[in-house]
């Protein structure tokens, strides 16, 4: 069975044919490191990690290159640095914010079981590439200088008599309608309401670099040009897959396409565009004002990362996901069972019943349903399939030990209470037996009686 992926540009599933099967290339937009990543940010991390693993499974680990960037120059970073480190020069404060936040991001995504990308470029290390693309755009008549800004003109792109794509094609928008519907105040230096910034002057104390070809003031890049530059540097002018959250389709990805295609006279930037759906919490949009804004770091204090991973993958990546406590509890119970059954088993090849749904536009929901079927039929294939999806990163004993430490429950105390309960049952003191059972339940311990004795585990 061949791999088929839904392409946001063509609005259909397409058979995946790599440009070079020995060098499959994927770019995914990464974090802007100004704050801890929230659970919505975890979705593209997990989704495209599964795709990365699947591509490596199909083409070989040495033949897949995955690039996920880090945006470390941005207004949000500047604002956070000034607020959190008022006693430091702004550049030093920015360094503190980006280093601390970047370190936490890596700790969080490692805990989610995500493989590190092949390359993780930082925007500030690619200013030269950004300047070169901007110079190409100005020379080609697609960008212009105004009041020390350099701006891209979508109108100039669509007016070009060439093989360039139409601005708005990715997001299925009409440029004329965008212009007609513009309701925001347009900066006076812009020629058109849809023109966007490639380069802007920096305020005193902010990070700054010499402008492209000296055509404007010392300043810094706009957000969109950063990803065009990093993708070009590490994957070339045209590559296989570009991914991210659906919120990035417009304007970010639309503008990336415009910049890259106009700079290099290409019909396409990426052969396939993939976007994951939105996430809400307990049927409500996640927001700080509603008090349901949850960071990955906060969730990891209560749940193993693999529980968060499974909870995310139970829903198809393009569908909206409702993040609920009930679903988390169900995911935890499922993983407890998988660890008991398969963690210490030599993994076999991933089962076809799991791989085939993944080949159909990364249908993790059906793949997970197939895992349940393997549990009682082929534990070796179950173990191999779980590892393909990024699960079973530790032994069953390590999993239980970590759960115990997280619970704060003393295993010796549990064993003592179970012995007392066994003695109470032996003397038919069922009232005392029930009291101890309830005490254990309050500690988060579930017990199971059998002919061989009483066993226990942590419940969720």
Curated annotation (Swiss-Prot):
Its EC number is 6.1.1.16. Binds 1 zinc ion per subunit. The keyword Glycoprotein does not apply. GO terms for molecular function: ATP binding; cysteine-tRNA ligase activity; zinc ion binding. GO terms for biological process: cysteinyl-tRNA aminoacylation. Keywords: Aminoacyl-tRNA synthetase, ATP-binding, Cytoplasm, Ligase, Metal-binding, Nucleotide-binding, Protein biosynthesis, Zinc. The keyword Ligase applies. Belongs to the class-I aminoacyl-tRNA synthetase family. This is Cysteine--tRNA ligase. The lineage of its organism: Bacteria, Pseudomonadati, Pseudomonadota, Alphaproteobacteria, Hyphomicrobiales. The gene is cysS.
